[in-house]
Each structure stands twice: as C-alpha cells, then as structure tokens.
From Swiss-Prot:
HAMAP family with a match to the protein in the record: HSV_RIR1_betahv
InterPro entries: HSV_RIR1_betahv, NrdE_NrdA_C, RNR_lg_C, RNR_lsu_N, Rrm1
GO MF annotation, one: ribonucleoside-diphosphate reductase activity, thioredoxin disulfide as acceptor
Cellular component, GO annotation: host cell cytoplasm; virion component
Database matches in PANTHER family: RIBONUCLEOSIDE-DIPHOSPHATE REDUCTASE LARGE CHAIN, RIBONUCLEOSIDE-DIPHOSPHATE REDUCTASE LARGE SUBUNIT
UniProt cross-references to SUPFAM superfamilies, sorted A to Z: PFL-like glycyl radical enzymes
Principal location class: virion
Gene3D superfamilies: 3.20.70.20
Stated role: Does not possess a ribonucleotide reductase activity. Betaherpesviruses probably use another strategy to expand the dNTP pool in a quiescent host cell.
Name of this chain's protein: Ribonucleoside-diphosphate reductase large subunit-like protein
Length: 806
C-alpha cells in the first residue's frame, strides 16, 4: 500500500478522495482518463478516439456513456458498455486491482477490531470463498453502472485512501454478520445445520442478488463510528413537545438520522403557528444532506385529521416542489370514513390542546369522545367533500398517504399500544410516545423463478408453484427467509451491542420487515399476467410462506435460548393468536397442522420479534437487485437506467410524443429488464423501432394470434383498474403484518372517495402511499436535466413512455 495514497479528511466536507491516476485530490469518484480505447474491445477505435479528445474533467459519466454508445451505433452493445463502465469506473468486478482481504486488514483505524481479527484468523478460508464467489458474480449478476454508482455513493467509505469497491463491501458485511452470529448462542445453533461456512452463505445471498440490506446497514456495519446507525427507518413522536424541545431534538436526533441516510418520520400535527418555521428548518436540513453528502434521505410528516392545523399543512403539501423528498400522511379515524360515505356531511377540527387530548383516546373510544367535543367544545367545520378535494390535490402530486386508525386498532398485534406508521413506505409499527425503528430486508422474488426440471415435476404444491414450463420455488424461498430473519436478528443484536444511536427504538418489539420485492418481475418471467387469477394466487401464497417461515424462525430463536422480545407478553401472540387469525375467511395453502403447531409453540416458547412481512418497497435498495421495485407494475427512473438497456435506431420521420430521446443522441432507448420482449419478437425490430409500443394498436397483421395473446402480459400500469389491483392486495393482507403501502394508478373515471372507502372496508392499515393520476403523469419533468432516459410508469417493457427531451 502506497503510504502517500492516504485519504484527507475535512470535517466540513467529508472525504477528499485521492485520484488513483493523478497525484491530486479530487472529490469526484470517477477519473475519466482511465477510460481509453485500449480498454474497449470494439473495432470503431477511430470514432472513440474522437470522443476521447473531447473529454474534459467536468464531463458527466452519462455523457461519456451515451457518446460511446452513439459512436458505436450500438444496437446491442449498451449493456456491455454499461458493464465496462461499471468495472473500470466503479470497480464492481470481482477481479479488482485492490485485494478486498488486504484492504480490510490494513484498515484498523476504520474497522472494528473483532472484524479485523476474524479476517486475519480466517484469511485462507476467505480467499477460497471469494474465489468461489467470482464464479457467482457473472455478468448477469453484476449491477448496471447507475445502480452501482448509487450504491457506492450511498456507502461512500474510503479505506486508507482507497474507495471501497462492491466486493469489499459484501465481504465486510458478511464477515461482520458471521462474527456476530458466532458470538450469539441462539443464532449459532440456528445456523448449525447449514453445510457451507457462514461467510459464504451470506456472501452468496448478496452476490446472487437474492436480498439486499438497507443502505445505512451496508454502509456502517463493521465500522468504528459515532452517530451512525444500521437502521434506515425511524419514527419519533414529537406531538407533545414544545417548539424549544423540538429544536433541541432536531439537532441531536433528526439531523444525524438524515445524515445517516435514514428515513425520518415525525408527527407534527400539534404545531400550528410554528408550522412555517418548522418546514423551513426541515427542508433546509434535507438540502444540507443532499448538497454536502452522498446520502439520500426522506421525511414523512404525519397529520391527525381532527387538528385545526390540518389545512395549513395541506397548503404546505400543495406548494412543495415534487422533487423534495417529503411525504405527508393523514391519520383517518373511523368516524371520518363513515362521514366520507355520506353526501353533504361536515368534518370538525379542534384547537391544539383539545385535539392533542382527543388523539390520546383509543379508537374504540375515539368516536364517542369526538362527538362529545363537537357538541360541547369550540371547533371549526369544513365540508367533507371540500376537504377531500384538498387531499386529492396533494395525492395528484404524489405526496400524500393515509392510515386507517380503526384497522390499525383492529388488526394490530399490540392492542394496548397506540400504533402509527414508519418510514418512506408507511410501515406499521407500535410505539409509546417515543422512538421506534425497524430493520428491513428486501427479498428478490424473481430469484426463485426456475425452469421445470424432471425432479421438480414430482414435488407437491407446497414446495413448488407450477405454471407451464416455469416454477416458483417456494421451498427455496422459505429457506432463504429463515436465513434473513436470523441475519436481521444478528443486525439488531449488533446495534444494541455497539450502542447504535437509534437502538432505543428497536428494543421492545425488535421489528423486522421482509420486504416483498420483484413480484412483477417474477410474474413476467413466468409469463403470468399481473392481474390474472393465478398471479393473485401466487402473490398470496408467497406472502403466506414468508409470514409462516418468519414467525417459525423467530419462535425457534426463543426455543434455542433467546429471550422473547419485551412486548411479547403484551401482544396477541402470547395468546396463541397469529396476524392471519385477525382476518375472516383466510385462504391457506400450507397444511393446517403447521399453523396449529406454530400457535402452540409460540405460546410455549415466545417470539424474538413482533413484526415480519412488509408489502412495501425499499426504494433505494431494489435497484441493485435488478428487479421491479414492488408488486405493482411501476418502474421509475432508477430501475430503467442500468445495464439491461437495449438500443434501437430511431425512425427519422416518426417522432411520437410517447417516445423518449436523449438530448444529444436522438436515439430511442427501450429498457427491457428481463430481455423477454425483444427476445420473443426479435423478428419485428423494424416494426418496434417505428411505433410507440401502444399495445392497443398492435393487430394480427403484425403478430400471430399466439404472439398477440402473449403480448397481453405487457400492459401499462394505467391499463389495470384499481379494483383489479385491490383484488391482488387483499388476498395477502392477513400475511403482511408490517407494511401495506401501495401505489395506485388512477384513471379519470375512478372516484377517489370510492377507492378510500374500499381500502378501509377491506382491512388495509395503510392506504395509498402514492396515487398516480393519468392526466398528471408528466408533472415534475425537468427538460434541462440531461439523459433522464426514461421517466414514468410501465411494467418493465416500455409500451407507453412519456417524455421527449428536445
């Protein structure tokens, strides 16, 4: 290691990384001089050399990427260019010039002593494991350039002047978790039956993109640091604090949490006259995080709908720029939902002290107390229809969500404790006027889709979901979920042991959330239409299996010696009641005897955790998994800008307003995240390059009848009715105990009032996380932003993209 190649630390600006090609410090991650024609195995060296002569130090990486693709006339080379850029600029390849083991051993001032000792003692074994991992890290598992860039920007660790590469990050995480598991007896006993070493087990999960831990966890696990957390979500109830107390908490808690990259949720309903100054404070701190660090964070503001300050906060919601990472969430009691059903009804809001007192009542007593306050106390009235219109305007901006207070009370596993929500995806967790956190893990469902083998044809439906020549391997998924619950508990124990500054919120319930990610990718891989009966059935079965495996594993932890979590005796689990028991007419696929035994075992041994399964997406981490963000047919910018981009030459005459062109190249980009569409219809490339991919315009003159039927799985999100979406979600509600956040695509003909009532009556705890209105889908586009290749909502194959960049 070059002793001169050290990192310089500036406390105000963070790390100044030393360029490995020049003898100078540079804050930029990429050094473009390292990218020259000798590194490209292409024939068009003359065109590339012309590009390179135009390069300068301020050139954006995406400019370089698109310039290379343009010069190559890259019909099929864009994915390869992405991988090449990823390897040379981001060091995502396993054969990196920096040895991960040596880098860890030489970073004693940055990494924990136990981690260093573990690596030193297991060096030979780790080298063999890493060699095996190289074979796993094939091209299809390597992240695209933008996914890798975002991942490394979020992690942003520098060891002795060398930026951590992805193999080093994965090794650091795996070694830290393996070391933690070996120290804790109940975890060690749970992993004892596994054949391969712990480090290898965890490494393979990460390398194969089976799962992804939260970015704060990936960034901070194993490091010696202060004011850092492994948790990416945190809720702090400040509704009973004075403004002075809030400002004090903000400096000591909220800002460090934002700088950590965690999503912060806060109840600010009681603040009325102070609302404007509070918003300015929070927005300024969000800007500080965005400007001075590589972290991204978000803020969710919870509003109780019976407060007088409600309308002021709704006004703030309407004027906030759509680019600001702030969400508002309304807490709706039963009486409001009943009045919503009635035309010409009115809603009453109360002044600060009375409204705060009203919010302390349990939902079972809330309605009677609310009616009493309406009769006896001073209040303001607003027509319910007018209030709903104000709310819908915020919904159209994509910055409003709902919580149904009655459903949380009815379906909560902790009935004695008021429950609110948490995080950017509105996950439901319990709290008692304090701090709460949860540990979330993204599970990539597309990993479990396989071709049918002769051996698998004999398996029962409990282990395999069959559809034509594909299967969804439920047995493999249950095994993986078991491992993830154990890993989650290891992270929680690690946080408590290392005095994590958000650790207080995890102690009582030890909340876990296995986030269901990539369902839509899995359905497309199986050629299953998203809204089909079989598609809905698979989603319900998946959630049932995840919930059962999670609860069973948590119980086994206690059976092997762990103490039940603090809130267990106060929960319905202590009575042998499962979350799915709270719902009527639940359909089960797993045998009843398994559920019966699970209930009795829980009463006997207890549970290490209280929440388990989330339908919410992890909005940053999913991109590295190379799958759809959630179970909804939506693909945002992040998932489309990566190595699975195919390029077709544009038609010089036809310029549809539904086509997407880059600023300089005028090249039509068609993202296909599983390659299914272009592979199937490769004989129709000429047609595809001249039409706008509107499925309704495709006819039998261009495709065979069989192809026409297959194309029905490629629908734009707006082609599904909200009722179709609800049918899928409702079946899995009994098994999604933690978060039920949903994105709905609403056409002009669909009534927001009806949708809200339907969600409420079907037992959703959290309602709409985001509503996308068809006539509003072009909002928030910044035409001056270069190479925003795709923005919008599709099912992975872009049938109807949205913007033209001139």
């Amino acid at each position: 290691m070059d002793p001169n190649n050290k990192v310089s630390i500036n406390k105000n600006m963070g790390l100044l990384r030393k360029c490995l090609c020049h003898d100078e410090y540079n804050k930029k991650r990429f050094c473009y001089s390292r990218f020259h024609h000798k590194t490209l195995l292409y024939k068009q060296l003359y065109e590339i050399s012309k590009i390179l002569r135009r390069l300068n130090s301020g050139l954006d990486m995406w400019c370089l990427r698109d310039a290379i693709i343009s010069a190559l006339g890259a019909m099929h080379d864009a994915p390869h260019v992405d991988r090449l850029l990823g390897q040379f600029y981001l060091k995502t390849n396993s054969a990196s010039e920096f040895d991960s083991i040596s880098l860890i051993l030489e970073s004693e001032n940055i990494l924990q002593k136990e981690l260093i000792e573990f690596v030193r003692d297991s060096k030979v074994e780790l080298e063999k494991i890493l060699q095996a991992a190289i074979h796993v890290w094939r091209a299809k598992f390597s992240p695209g350039v933008l996914a890798a860039s975002r991942f490394l920007d979020e992690i942003s660790n520098s060891f002795n002047g060398i930026e951590e590469n992805i193999p080093t990050i994965f090794l650091r995480i795996s070694v830290t978790l393996a070391s933690q598991i070996k120290k804790i007896e109940y975890l060690q006993k749970s992993f004892v039956s596994h054949k391969c070493p712990l480090v290898e087990e965890i490494l393979i999960l990460l390398y194969k993109r089976v799962c992804m831990l939260p970015f704060p966890c990936m960034s901070n696990l194993g490091l010696v640091s202060e004011k850092k957390s492994v948790f990416d979500t945190v809720f702090h109830n400040v509704s009973n604090f004075s403004l002075e107390d809030f400002l004090d908490i903000n400096s000591g808690f909220f800002l460090p949490a934002m700088l950590n990259g965690s999503y912060v949720s806060v109840n600010l309903t009681r603040y009325h006259y102070e609302a404007e100054s509070l918003m300015e404070l929070l927005l300024s701190q969000l800007q500080i995080v965005e400007k001075d660090t590589n972290k991204t964070t978000g803020l969710t503001i919870y509003l109780e709908i019976w407060h007088l300050s409600l309308l002021m906060w709704l006004d703030f919601c309407e004027i906030l720029p759509t680019t600001v990472q702030v969400k508002f969430c309304l807490i709706l009691p039963e009486i409001f939902m009943e009045r919503l059903k009635t035309e010409n009804s009115y809603w009453s809001v109360f002044h600060k002290a009375l409204a705060i007192n009203l919010g302390l009542y349990d939902e079972s007593d809330f309605t009677s107390k609310y009616l009493e306050c309406e009769r006896t106390a001073e209040h303001a009235r607003i027509k319910t229809e007018t209030l709903l219109d104000n709310i819908c305007r915020c919904l159209r901006r994509g910055q409003m969500g709902f919580i149904f207070r009655k459903n949380i009370h009815k379906y909560s596993m902790l009935p004695q404790i008021a429950s609110y929500c948490l995080g950017n995806s509105m996950d439901v967790i319990p709290f008692e006027y304090g701090l709460n956190t949860a540990f979330r893990i993204a599970l990539n469902l597309s990993y479990f889709v396989e071709n049918v083998s002769e051996e698998q044809k004999s398996h029962t439906n409990i282990d395999m979901f069959h559809y034509r020549d594909k299967i969804f391997n439920l047995k493999k998924m249950r095994k993986t979920v078991t491992e993830l619950v154990l890993i989650g508990n290891a992270v929680i124990d690690y946080a408590l042991e290392n005095r994590d500054f958000l650790m207080d919120g995890i102690v009582n319930a030890r909340s876990l959330a296995i986030c269901v990610t990539g369902l839509h990718s899995a359905l497309m891989s199986m050629n299953l239409p998203f809204n089909s009966q079989l598609g809905c059935q698979l989603y319900r079965i998946v959630c049932e299996n995840i919930y059962y495996s999670s609860v069973r594993t948590s119980m086994n932890c206690c059976k092997k010696g762990a103490e039940p979590c603090s809130f267990f005796q106060r929960s319905k689990y202590a009575q042998g009641i499962l979350h799915c028991d709270l719902y009527d007419n639940v359909e089960y696929t797993l045998p009843n005897v398994l559920w019966t035994n699970l209930r009795s075992d829980i009463k006997k041994y207890g549970l290490r955790n209280l929440t388990f399964v989330s339908g919410s997406a992890m909005s940053k981490e999913f991109d590295l998994l190379n799958c759809s963000q959630s179970f909804c047919p939506i693909e945002g910018n992040k998932i489309l800008k990566r190595s699975s981009i195919k390029v077709l030459h544009p038609n010089p005459v036809f310029h549809s307003d539904l086509s997407v062109y880059s600023t300089e190249l005028q090249t039509l980009y068609i993202p296909v995240y599983n390659g299914l569409f272009l592979n199937r219809f490769k004989n129709h490339l000429e047609y595809l390059s001249s039409v706008n991919y509107d499925v309704s315009k495709v006819n039998k003159n261009l495709f065979s009848e069989e192809e026409m039927q297959e194309m029905t799985i490629f629908l734009n999100a707006f082609d599904y009715s909200v009722n179709e979406m609800l049918n899928m979600y409702v079946g899995a509600l009994p098994f999604t105990d933690h978060g039920q956040a949903n994105v709905f695509f609403i056409n002009k003909t669909e009534n927001m009032r009806d949708i809200l009532v339907c969600l409420y009556q079907n037992g959703f705890k959290t309602g709409i996380y985001q509503a996308v209105y068809k006539n509003q889908k072009c909002d928030g586009v910044n035409p001056s932003k270069k190479f925003d290749l795709l923005s919008g909502f599709s099912d992975g194959v872009v049938m109807s993209t949205m913007h033209v960049f001139q």
